[in-house]
């Protein structure tokens, strides 16, 4: 019954509530990515006060996750967060996004992020990747750690050369 809730690239283990997301970042042919690839994680926390006639307001918090050997990743899903969005970034590939809602009965998610090669990487970097990443450096509301901001700035400098 729960398998209908996810795309074919997602597998799961049962549990009380979603606590971890793990998987592998792959290129379009199924090879593992690594090196300069990384993941931006956005966790969404519900606002404490909500009036009955309002839509819920979610406060985002960002962090950066580096890949382990073989392109593997493991992301802790903060128990206070109600949703998490992962944005997979690698040079020469299009950004891949996936959003997970916390669900009762799903303990751990496994996601294979299959990246598609970008034939015009320079244009994609300038028009999509750079503005997306610069937002995390400039916007204090994301509370991205200074070391992660520095990593993003250095990464953007290397890619723009």
Placement of each model-derived feature along the sequence:
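Short, ordered, surface-exposed loop/turn motifs in non-cytosolic proteins
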Residues: 28-55
